[in-house]
């Protein structure tokens, strides 16, 4: 087995035993990138030179016995985090030449833990999309079928982990942008509780929904990464001062005696039969571990998509108002005056989907429509949150499909925004409620496409998610396949 195929914890063991160097690991990963990146297109910007320098520093630390949580481990970053001295585009022309003067908090934490950054991964422009097709830099392909999408908006990170172009990666999740691509690419992806991980240095899409989380090859690696990135940050006003446990302590506890809720509203017409079959088998596996699965109701589920597509665009229209070509980023040429520069810069700098959502959000916030749309959506959001609070009083966790279908073909839904928006129908609710969720591989379709199962828990109960995800992963006996590239 090649080094690039291993997990964080497997590489950690080899490093501690003196059997491998960080330089060898990084060279192995970049060798893999050289072999498959042309087909997959996971990255916008590669950081090869700095990665090799960081690997050499890591090897010096290893020789002195100074080994941290991620020393020498190659990690990819979604191109939505500010990285000092490294271009950060958010998948958009309007930030094509933007080089931040500072690092996001998660970047600082990963660096302090010893991680080696391989590059900045592709994404839907400003995280607005479910397929990584709206990126200014071209679409990413699903490693399992190069004619299909990897999911979005963090499709580049998910594809990079699935294709072994990194050992792990970070993404962001506003309505499912970690969990959905994780499911479609056959990897583990977690959205932590809102406020668990600092958003300082994350380029905002919808500030009350965005959350940063990991993509990994297994659940143990997810716990390792979460240990590093979680925690309170004074620089983020939405960060919550809650103690961070050692998440690896939850991995071997089992779930005997647990109650697992199965929301009836998530098993609706339109779910692909093979996805339904994989989820039903997963439920049987969970029951075999000593848990009791019972049907529950989340009565306001039908409103989730509508509420999300009022609140998220409204917040986006405000957040994206800062991109005007004045101080940084793309600036249109041949402008008559300041207003003309604003208009031409934003018209040319933003893609179609971003402009669609900005216009939608501006409309819902406008005078005469605020009460009818944004205020009402915010009220229904409160009801959705209460649904989860009531359900989780009687359940340890909730189990659902991550996506209604496997990965669809490239271009299949680009002309039908509503169909694209429905790709996140099972993931949006967790963002609206602010609760954590994790997607874990639970099988494959007959054509070999991955299927994911989602677990949801109460606020700051990531430990429970890792506990059931780890128990399921160990006992489901899902065949360990790798995409052929």
Curated annotation (Swiss-Prot):
Q: Which domain of life is it from?
A: Bacteria
Q: Does this UniProt record's set of keywords contain Ribosomal protein?
A: no
Look up the record and report any one GO term of the cellular component aspect.
Answer: glutamyl-tRNA(Gln) amidotransferase complex
One Gene Ontology term of the biological-process aspect is: translation
What GO MF annotations does this protein's record show? ATP binding; glutaminyl-tRNA synthase (glutamine-hydrolyzing) activity
Q: Which Pfam families match?
A: Amidase (PF01425)
List the catalysed reactions.
L-glutamyl-tRNA(Gln) + L-glutamine + ATP + H2O = L-glutaminyl-tRNA(Gln) + L-glutamate + ADP + phosphate + H(+)
- What's in the keyword line of the UniProt record? ATP-binding, Ligase, Nucleotide-binding, Protein biosynthesis
- EC number(s): the record gives 6.3.5.7
Q: Does the keyword Nucleotide-binding apply?
A: yes
Q: Which residues form the active site?
A: 78, 153, 177
- SUPFAM superfamilies, sorted: Amidase signature (AS) enzymes (SSF75304)
Q: Which family does it belong to?
A: Belongs to the amidase family. GatA subfamily.
The record's note on quaternary structure and interaction partners says:
Heterotrimer of A, B and C subunits.
According to its UniProt entry, the function of this protein is described as: Allows the formation of correctly charged Gln-tRNA(Gln) through the transamidation of misacylated Glu-tRNA(Gln) in organisms which lack glutaminyl-tRNA synthetase. The reaction takes place in the presence of glutamine and ATP through an activated gamma-phospho-Glu-tRNA(Gln).
Supply the name of the protein.
Glutamyl-tRNA(Gln) amidotransferase subunit A
Q: Which organism is it from?
A: Syntrophus aciditrophicus (strain SB)
Originating gene: gatA
